[in-house]
């Protein structure tokens, strides 16, 4: 199977402008660029849970990436995509953001994302209820703390979250998630479902089946798929869908016959819709 670039080089590129209301009562114009790939949006690759795990292992074993390398690249791309979707000028509440982190790699991506958001001028806080003693995560936590990013001891009620934050980043579970949600994360997801500010999910909306989705679960406004979109992303009906993690080698793209868009310029992420 040909690569995205080779097979769809003749796709149509067009631009348009959207106008949205801001939280401050004004409006903001958004310049959007869309690549129409033979008018078949479905031609983009959506990988299964097993394929995602195999790709991850090949990045580690065959291409000698380390976990912290990929986590840094992924978390940075998340922060850039969020900054594009929710510019500082469009936010009230002093651009406050809550990043909810789980115990695994998705949570690590969230910690990296929080650090970069801070460097971009946002005011992130972190809710990290199940910490780990692994050095990688301890170091990521220290890096956030050294930037005076506050860590919440408990998750406030939905109304307080909605009043206190411009949006909430869901970095609880990634593509390795299976089975039932375990404590304390069931209560966390229940609370997040009741907030009125945007939920922004990293790679997989937490609580979703990685392939089948979850129509009754969290319904984020924003999703950034990492490496390649997972099958559940086909069920995503939110406003912003990005692809990030610009580190997939051509050999993996060819081996898994991935149809992925070409990142523009030096961008670490690309908007899919």
Curated annotation (Swiss-Prot):
EC nos: 5.1.99.6
Positions that bind K(+): 106, 170, 206
Binding site for (6S)-NADPHX: 105-109, 174-180, 203
Keywords tagged on the record: Isomerase, Metal-binding, NAD, NADP, Nucleotide-binding, Potassium
Signal peptide residue numbers: none
InterPro entries xrefs: YjeF_N_dom (IPR004443), YjeF_N_dom_sf (IPR036652), YJEFN_prot_NAXE-like (IPR032976)
Top-level taxonomic group: Eukaryota
Species of provenance: Branchiostoma floridae
General function of this protein: Catalyzes the epimerization of the S- and R-forms of NAD(P)HX, a damaged form of NAD(P)H that is a result of enzymatic or heat-dependent hydration. This is a prerequisite for the S-specific NAD(P)H-hydrate dehydratase to allow the repair of both epimers of NAD(P)HX.
Record field: catalytic activity: (6R)-NADHX = (6S)-NADHX; (6R)-NADPHX = (6S)-NADPHX
Cellular compartments per GO CC: mitochondrion
Pfam families: YjeF_N (PF03853)
One MF term in the entry's GO annotations: NAD(P)HX epimerase activity
Family named by the database record: Belongs to the NnrE/AIBP family.
Gene3D superfamilies: YjeF N-terminal domain
Broadest EC class assigned to this enzyme: isomerase
Descriptive protein name: NAD(P)H-hydrate epimerase
SUPFAM superfamilies, alphabetized: YjeF N-terminal domain-like
Cofactor: record remark: Binds 1 potassium ion per subunit.
Domain YjeF N-terminal: 52-260
Cofactors: K(+)
């Amino acid at each position: 199977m040909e690569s995205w670039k080779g097979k769809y080089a003749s796709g149509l590129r067009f631009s348009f402008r959207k106008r949205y209301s801001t939280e401050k009562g004004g409006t903001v114009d958004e310049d959007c660029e869309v690549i129409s790939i033979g008018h078949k949006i479905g031609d983009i690759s959506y990988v299964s849970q097993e394929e995602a795990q195999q790709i991850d292992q090949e990045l580690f074993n065959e291409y000698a990436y380390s976990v912290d390398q990929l986590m840094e690249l992924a978390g940075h791309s998340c922060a850039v995509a969020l900054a594009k979707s929710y510019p500082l000028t469009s936010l009230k509440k002093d651009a406050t953001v809550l990043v909810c982190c789980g115990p695994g790699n998705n949570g690590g991506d969230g910690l990296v994302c929080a650090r970069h958001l801070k460097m971009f001028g946002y005011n992130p806080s972190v809710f990290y209820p199940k910490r780990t003693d692994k050095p990688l995560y301890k170091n990521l936590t220290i890096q956030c703390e050294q930037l005076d990013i506050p860590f919440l001891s408990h998750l406030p009620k939905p109304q307080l979250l909605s009043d206190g934050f411009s949006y909430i980043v869901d970095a609880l579970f990634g593509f390795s998630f299976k089975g039932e949600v375990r404590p304390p994360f069931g209560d966390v997801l229940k609370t997040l479902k009741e907030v009125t500010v945007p939920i922004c999910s990293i790679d997989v909306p937490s609580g979703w089946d990685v392939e089948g989705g979850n129509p009754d679960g969290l319904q984020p406004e924003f999703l950034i798929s990492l490496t390649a979109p997972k099958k559940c992303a086909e069920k995503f009906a939110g406003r912003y869908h990005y692809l990030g993690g610009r580190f997939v080698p051509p050999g993996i793209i060819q081996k898994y016959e991935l149809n992925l868009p070409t990142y523009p310029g030096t961008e670490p992420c690309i908007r899919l819709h």
